[in-house]
Amino acid sequence: MLFGGCLRSSLMEALRLILERGSLSGAGDELDGRGFFLRAAESGEPLRWQDPLLSEVGAQVIRVAGTSYRSAELGDPGFEPGNPLALVREPDNPHDANAIAVWNDERTAQAGYVPANVAAVLAGFEELCALSLWEWRDSTGDRIGLRALVYPEGTVRVPRLR
């Protein structure tokens, strides 16, 4: 399944990914949760979230910053792992001229921001895309954190979910 225009590549050498459903518990805050692991479609090999294959095409897996300030909005079903996300640049942001807000695809709920150090790197790319990959929930089942795949348009294709 392809999501929106962001996943239709016009580049010959787009990185093709498989999203593999999974969950972890007891591994520590950075990993505990549920969502999708990444695999390279051509080799079938698993990719780490900091894998060089991702960075070669300008893609990064990020932990969305500022989610603790938006706990009510994080409950929006648009943030479920596997859903496309909208990235909205905020050049007039008083804290960071490179700020990139992370919204659900309908732009009705904001989860937070791309971390400032990553937003600075992505500033050179004209069009950006994102896909929700991983979520953390508290003991009551409320979503409290989100990890996303962020990439320049046309560099990544996600052909199927497992």
Residue ranges with predicted function:
Residues 1-162:
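Conserved active-site motif detector
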